[in-house]
Amino acid sequence: MKNDICSKDYSSFVDIVQYKDRNPNKYDRNKFEKNEIDIIWEQKEDKYYQIVLMLLYSGVRISEMLDLKKENVHLDEQYFDVICSKTENGIRKVPIADKILPYYKAWYESCPECEYLLHTEAGKHFEYRNYYDSYFKPLMEQLGINRTPHCCRHTCISMLAEAGINQTIIKKIVGHLGAMTLTEKVYTHFDIKELVDAINRI
């Protein structure tokens, strides 16, 4: 090589096919099918399947749910505050649907000494790996369903869209504020009742 000139083009020997799907920022976008959700509802008496339903009908990220503290859960008004999110836009109020409100109440009362809504059998804060490996994954395998916690979020967004919910309301609920137009951010405001009404339609 002389003067930065190479006599041979070696790029033709580089195989990029094996790397094309290795995007570290790519999430699993598969959503739960209706029959799969129905199967999970059949297990609703199990408190750990209840967590899956809480994820499906809130659209929160798994980290947001596991980090949710009781002090930020408002059962009477049917919403909770997400104050810990991976993005600034994720800080928001999330409505609690009527159909899963009893599960929030049950978890809220299940371990008075734990500050977190969800907790291990020992009353400790759930770490993601612990929750996924010991609970979510085995529960899905038991039902023959191949899904990840993030699929719950994507499913909620899809169900809201299919129910004809206003796109701005969907963005408010799931924390996609970064995708909002300036007009949506500045001039569009919804009270919690409107958000609860929206989540109750799925």
Describe these PLM feature segments.
Residues N35, I39-Q43, H74-Y79, I83-E121, ...:
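Basic, alpha-helical nucleic-acid-contacting "clamp/cap" segments
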